[in-house]
Amino acid sequence: MVKNNILIFALIFIFILIFAIRASTFGVYNLDLNKSYNAYKKDYMSKDGRIMDPERDNSTTSEGQAYMLIMSHALNDKKTFDLVYTWTKNNLSRKDKLFAWLWGKNQDGKYQILDNNSASDADIDIAFCLLSAYEQWNDEKYLKEAVPIIQAIWDKETKRVGNHLILMPGVKQTTSEKIEVNPSYFSPYSFRLFQKYDDKHDWNELVDSSYFYLSAVMSKTRTGLPPNWFLIQNGQIIIEDSKRGDFSYDAIRVFWRVYSDYKRTGEKRAVPILEKVNFFIDKWKTTQKLYTNYQSNGELRDKDEFVGSIAILIPVIKLYDKKTAAEIYKSEIVPYFAKDGYWQNKHNYYARNLLWFGEYMYTNKSLLK
């Protein structure tokens, strides 16, 4: 009997040892997403559901509200989800059912909307989260809130350019002759869900145009990476020779959006886009560095290794090279996770969002259900 117990304990020990070695090899460090989420709420969220950016005088954006909806939905935190959406609706809603993108303190010290223009990426994320909440929690109120927003996105934030319908960055930009486009706003998985609940519009056309323009604009950069912004003028795609034409803090989200669509649907058009992470895999293997800001001509803009961008890249890199993804994760992500539940800079709101999203996706979870 004693021998049997010893054998059992020995087998358990060996199993634990093997798992520990495998975890170390493949980057399974089980960083506590709940702990990070709670720290995020403590650091950024007011009692009434407003997300504040400490690096921008505690201002609030529709993007920040949307990101908190994504996180709270992913962790099944209905109470926080409702709190954040209620604040968003009460304080950022426009007459057309979209949301003002910037809210904060004016020159007189009064808190109000500072810029009433919309931001289509946030509007899309909010509507998507409401539909996802409806499906997850089976509450009709979320569907009733989502449908008018979806219709307003179509009516106010899309524009036909030649043979293609394109997503505009906001309401004001739809009236300009020179069309400015942010490709990181393209959200094919959201458009597919909108189609499910809106049979009046062809949202699949917007899926198609998203992939068309992503492919077209990425073919014009030497790195093959998407730019932060591009222009459409006289039917031609133009990438500006400035930071707006760089692959940087905005453009990194293209990988999040396309990866999410690929994981949900297996979309074949996503593959050539996601394969561009091989650029970073090659850089890592030769330099052990992962610089994240590149000009469209292929040259480095600077030697910034923005940890938020790296976090978004790792799940995509994992599709093509698990070993390299694990190396980067161990070297560039794990050391920055603080005991208080935040990564690297406690006050960098944008980096902490991207880090949380990247970590969630890297640990084989579907961020956007």
Q: Where are the regions that the model predicts?
A:
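N-terminal Sec-pathway targeting helices
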Residues: M1-I12
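Low-complexity, Ser/Thr/Pro/Gly-enriched N-terminal "stalk/linker" regions
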Residues: F19-E63, H73-Q107, Q112-I113, G162-P169, ...
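Extended ligand-binding clefts on enzyme/binding-domain cores
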Residues: F26-L31, K35, N58-S62, L143-K323, ...
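Second-shell loop/turn segments in exported
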Residues: P54-N58, I70-A74, I113-N117, Q136-N138, ...
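Aromatic-rich carbohydrate-recognition surfaces in CAZymes
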Residues: N58-Q65, I113-Y134
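Short glycine/serine- and small hydrophobic-enriched flexible loop segments
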Residues: L69-N76, D125-E135, Y189-K196, W256-S260, ...
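Inward-facing hydrophobic residues that define packing positions of alpha-helical scaffold repeats
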Residues: Y85, L130, L143-A146, I150, ...
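C-terminal functional modules
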Residues: G298-K369
